[in-house]
A protein has these predicted regions:
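A short glycine-rich, aromatic-capped structural motif
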Residues: 9-176, 184-195, 290
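Bacterial Sec-dependent N-terminal signal peptides
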Residues: 1-13, 229
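A short local loop/turn or secondary-structure capping micro-motif enriched for an aromatic residue
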Residues: 33-35, 302-304, 353-354
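Short, P/G- and charge-enriched loop/turn segments at secondary-structure junctions
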Residues: 3-5, 37, 317-320, 349-354
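Short, structured beta-strand segments at or near domain termini in extracellular proteins/domains
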Residues: 359-375
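Short, surface-exposed beta-strand/loop micro-motifs that present aromatic residues
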Residues: 39-41, 282-284, 354
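Functional-site microenvironments in short loops/helix caps that host divalent-cation chemistry
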Residues: 17-18, 24, 29, 127-346, ...
Length: 377
């Protein structure tokens, strides 16, 4: 067909290519009791791009500001009609945040002489397509039936620093972590699974708006993709750095975690550390273990390895609000700054509920490769 666009592949900024391969998922250490429930399994994973670091406060703040500005433009009536006659936000229109029309963005009460955002109105709307339902329908219904609309509050829950730790003074983190420049390059926390997924849809929309050819969506990694990437090509490696130890030859810790009872700061960070702290693994990925645990797209099922497919393995379920709580569990991987070393192992599984926010859970995005291999482009 003539006049087809020339596809030269993509190389997204801040992402590294994870080549396709085969990986032996499951516990790498001699966890006999755990093996009874979660049996090891060999699977194949397609190639993909992955953020080399966790999403930082600075990166997530771009999303929050985009939502803030879109609301401000809406309140100001800054629209124009495109070539199809549809209304679009006029992003070139100047914004005056002192104008009376946009004061709904702020709370009436000031704190320390500053205006405070009304975070409850910072909402992002997007649509998803239910591919499983559409495949099961076999074309009998209109595709419109399978689109689902979502409205998600995007402002991080800064109160997690207080709520997660009773009888503990963490108010300075609640006040400053998401906004102070000192924490710009630290991983964003206080985001639930829905917020992390919404960030991916916004990022995809932003990418496609400035590129002639649309790409695949930026999304959360599946559990299998995360484990494969964390291992860095090292088969049966218990940690991303390969060896069975959490300290190097000099006795220095190799990740940000809790090495002993009541011992948080030995690695140099009482809480989180910058997203590019410590050495990357052999794929070039930082902090795949430690710092913050990370959301995956996968639903948590205890014995998933006994029934998942051996190609691009995944368990996907869209839990509704009225579903049983157990159905709302999503796999988190990597362990965090407040966890012991067991949770840092590449084969260790854990979960959080999809609608909960934590001070120790963040995320990063992946992008599926289009084509056979990145080396083809």
């Amino acid at each position: 067909m003539l006049e087809r666009p020339d596809w030269k592949g993509v190389n997204p900024y801040g992402m590294v290519y994870v080549r396709p391969g085969t990986v032996h998922i499951g516990n790498s250490d001699q966890d006999i009791t755990g093996t009874f429930i979660q049996r090891p399994k060999s699977i194949s994973i397609s190639g993909f791009y992955m953020d080399d670091t966790e999403i930082s406060n600075n990166e997530y703040r771009q999303f929050v500001f985009w939502v803030r500005d879109s609301i401000a433009h809406d309140l100001m009536g800054d629209y124009y009609a495109d070539e199809n006659g549809e209304e679009r936000i006029d992003w070139e229109a100047p914004l005056d945040f002192s104008a009376p029309e946009v004061q709904d963005l702020y709370l009436e009460t000031r704190f320390a002489g500053r205006k405070l955002y009304n975070a409850n109105i910072f909402k992002y709307d997007y649509k998803t397509f239910d591919w499983d339902a559409a495949a099961a329908d076999r074309g009998r219904s209109s595709p419109e039936r399978f689109f689902e609309e979502h409205t998600i509050e995007v402002y991080p829950d800064t109160m997690v620093w207080i709520r997660d730790f009773a009888y503990s003074y963490n108010e300075p983190m609640a006040r400053n972590y998401f906004w102070h420049p000192a924490y710009d390059n630290y991983p964003v926390v206080g985001v639930n699974w829905h917020m992390a997924r919404a960030f991916g849809y916004w990022r995809t929309s932003l990418w496609n708006s400035v590129n002639e050819i649309s790409t695949e969506e930026f999304r959360l990694p599946t559990e299998a993709e995360y484990e494969y990437a964390a291992r860095g090509g090292r088969e049966h490696a218990p940690y991303p750095w390969g060896g069975p130890y959490v300290r190097n030859a000099k006795g220095c810790l190799l990740a940000n975690f809790k090495p002993g009872r009541g011992n948080y700061p030995e690695d140099g960070g009482q809480y989180t550390v910058p997203v590019d702290a410590y050495y990357p693994n052999d794929f070039g990925l930082y902090n795949m273990s430690g710092n913050v645990a990370e959301w995956t797209s996968t639903a948590f099922v205890e014995n998933a390895n006994s029934f998942i497919h051996d190609m691009n393995s995944d368990v996907h379920y869209e839990a509704d609000e009225d579903d049983p709580e157990a159905w709302k569990r999503k796999v988190v991987r990597g362990g965090s700054w407040k966890d012991v070393s067991f949770y840092l192992q590449t084969g260790t599984r854990s979960y959080e509920f999809q609608d909960t926010t934590k001070s120790y859970v963040g995320f990063r995005n992946v992008l599926s490769l289009m084509g056979r291999s990145a080396s083809d482009f």
